[in-house]
């Protein structure tokens, strides 16, 4: 019998900027110039993926499914199409909500990869470290 706890992880994009307006402008800019042909290709090519189908269902309700969760990227690429968008505090709040629900690992990326990783490491990680200090010590 398995004695470990089973947890779950999430794959998300991050768009973290100093202001919420900058973050949303960048997020919308990621998909603003996608052609109808590109959107149709992504939709058709990955139609058999259950995970992609479920994300597209969410995206059909609107590009913003929660205060800081953007589905627009699903229109132009498969997988990892949901982005956490906002200021460092807003990004940390959104990820903290998932942590509090039991998410124990994240696979995060962004555009441009190195720049977003640097912003995340400097701005968001310190907030999450502080908020989860006790959890990290107990692990």
Give the residues covered by each predicted segment.
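C-terminal helical cap(s) of enzyme catalytic domains, especially alpha/beta-barrels
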Residues: 113-134
